[in-house]
A protein has these predicted regions:
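Short-chain dehydrogenase/reductase
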Residues: 139
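Conserved "HGTGT" condensation-loop signature of ketosynthase/thiolase-family condensing enzymes
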Residues: 1-129, 133-136, 144-151, 155-267
Length: 267
C-alpha cells in the first residue's frame, strides 16, 4: 500500500480472486424475502437497509460463512433519512422519550451488522465512510485481510436516494454537469478470496483522474440506468463482472470528485 499526494494506491501481493458478487437497486432488486425470511425483521428495516443486507447475503449465498474472515462495508452518506429523523426527534422532544429505531437504523455499520447477524458470522466487522473514497478503503482493507488469512472477506458499498440527500447534493453542487444528474441509490457487494474462478482484482487507486488505461469502463456510462450516488463504483463493478469481458479492465468512478478506480482481470 502506498500513500502519495493523499492518493491511496494498493496492489495486492497476488491478484485477489472474486468468489462472487451481487448488486441491487430499487429497479433491479434481489429477492429480499428469500434472503431475509424473518418477516418481523424485514418490517423493522428501512428500504435501503433491507436492500443492502439482502444484497450482501446474496453475495454470500454459495460461500461457507464459517470461512468468512470479515465483513467490510462503505457508504458515502449512510442513512440520511433516518439520521435527519432522529436529529429532528432530539430537538422536537427535548432529548426525552425518544424512539430508538431511527438511531439504530442511521448508524453507518448497520448493514454490516445485519449481515453478520443473518449469516451468524462473528468476525472482523467494520464500515468506512468518506463519500466515494470509502469504498477504496473498504476494498483495500478486504484484500489485505484476504492476504493475511487466506479466507473469504465480504466487501461492499451502499447509498440511498432521499429528499435529504437531494437537498445535501444541491447545496454542495454534487453530481452536476450543467444540470444536476438524476439521483440514484443501490448496493454492491463482492466476496473476495477462495478459489480462482476467473475474476481477480489487481489493484485499487483512490483517485481515478490521474490514470490512463487502454480499456476503461466509466461509471458515468451507467447514469441513465443507475443514477448518480457516492457508492456507484461497487454496483458497476458487479455489473461488469457479470458481463465477463475478457482481459484487464479499469473500472473508473468518474461520477464523483476524485472517485476511485479498480483494476480487474477477467478470463
Amino acid at each position: 500500500m502506498m500513500l502519495k499526494d493523499n492518493i491511496l494506491e494498493y496492489v495486492p501481493k497476488r491478484p485477489c480472486p472474486v468468489a462472487s458478487c451481487c448488486f441491487a437497486t430499487p429497479a433491479e432488486p434481489v429477492d429480499v424475502k428469500a434472503l431475509i425470511p424473518d418477516a418481523n425483521l424485514r418490517r423493522r428495516m428501512g428500504p435501503l437497509l433491507r436492500l443492502a443486507a439482502a444484497c450482501g447475503m446474496s453475495a454470500l449465498e454459495n460461500v461457507d460463512t464459517g470461512n468468512v474472515a470479515g465483513i467490510i462495508t462503505s457508504t458515502g452518506l449512510g442513512f440520511m433519512k433516518d439520521t435527519v429523523s432522529f436529529a429532528d426527534m432530539l430537538i422536537d422532544r427535548n432529548e426525552e422519550m425518544l424512539n430508538p429505531s431511527p438511531f439504530m437504523q442511521s448508524t453507518f455499520n448497520t448493514v454490516s451488522g445485519y449481515i453478520a447477524l443473518l449469516g451468524g458470522i462473528r468476525t472482523y466487522n467494520t464500515a468506512y465512510v468518506h463519500r466515494s473514497g470509502g469504498f477504496a478503503a473498504a476494498l483495500t482493507d478486504a484484500m489485505m485481510l484476504v492476504e493475511d488469512t487466506g479466507r473469504n472477506v465480504l466487501a461492499g458499498g451502499f447509498d440511498e436516494a432521499s429528499p435529504e440527500v437531494d437537498e445535501y447534493r444541491r447545496k454542495l453542487g454534487c453530481w452536476k454537469r450543467g444540470d444536476f444528474l438524476p439521483l440514484g441509490e443501490g448496493a454492491g457487494f463482492l466476496c473476495l478470496g477462495g478459489g480462482d474462478n476467473g475474476v481477480r482484482i489487481l489493484g485499487v487507486h483512490s483517485s481515478c483522474h490521474t490514470l490512463e488505461f487502454d480499456r476503461k469502463v466509466l461509471c458515468s456510462s451507467y447514469i441513465d440506468r443507475l443514477g448518480a450516488f457516492f457508492s456507484i463504483l461497487p454496483v458497476v463493478l458487479c455489473i461488469v463482472i457479470g458481463q465477463r469481458p475478457e482481459g484487464r479492465i479499469l473500472v473508473v468512478d468518474d461520477v464523483n470528485p476524485s472517485g476511485p478506480a479498480v483494476l480487474l482481470e477477467i478470463d
